[in-house]
């Protein structure tokens, strides 16, 4: 196809805003906020096999995976095996996550592009540590919690995605429900 021209882009943006306002005003959907689960609930929406039952007020569209119905995926393999594409986020994307007090990360440090990784992940919107491997990130492997640091052989930028990654490391080479 041909690229959009500026007027078309603005028209589509306005259509999107109008549609979103209708959804918000309908009252059918609400954002999930369980204060006791804030450290995990965002990622849980993408990894919990029962998410479509738990987060019914937030999901507008969801795909439920079910091994009995042969509706599965191999996403874990794509997120941990180098032969599948080496997905990673870049620093500009990570910088869009605010600090926990709502201020931009980029205004917190004069040298924000050169702070160490641990500092970069500290005091941020909790969704950041539910999106990338971070200091302290663990997964379950054969019944034990195991630390998983960012794998620079996989995520060349150091920002290794985890948002959709199952906590069960034994699923990395299997089809996941």
Tell what function each PLM region has.
Residues 1-153:
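An aromatic- and glycine-enriched ligand-binding surface/loop that stacks and positions planar moieties
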Residues 146-177:
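Active-site beta-strand/loop architecture of penicillin-binding DD-peptidases
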């Amino acid at each position: 196809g041909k690229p959009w021209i500026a007027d078309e882009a603005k028209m589509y943006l306005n259509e999107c805003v109008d549609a979103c306002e209708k959804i918000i005003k309908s009252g059918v959907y609400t954002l999930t906020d369980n204060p006791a689960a804030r450290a995990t609930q965002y990622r849980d929406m993408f990894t919990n096999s029962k998410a479509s039952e738990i987060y019914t007020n937030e999901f507008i569209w969801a795909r439920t995976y079910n091994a009995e119905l042969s509706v599965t995926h191999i996403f874990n393999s794509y997120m941990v095996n180098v032969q599948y594409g080496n997905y990673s986020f870049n620093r500009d994307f990570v910088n869009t996550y605010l600090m926990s007090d709502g201020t931009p990360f980029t205004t917190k440090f004069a040298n924000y592009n050169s702070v160490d990784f641990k500092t970069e992940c500290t005091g941020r919107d909790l969704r950041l540590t539910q999106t990338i491997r971070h200091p302290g990130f663990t997964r379950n492997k054969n019944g034990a919690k195991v630390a998983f640091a960012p794998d620079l052989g996989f995520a060349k930028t150091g920002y290794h995605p985890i948002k959709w990654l199952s906590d069960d490391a034994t699923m990395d080479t299997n089809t996941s429900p």
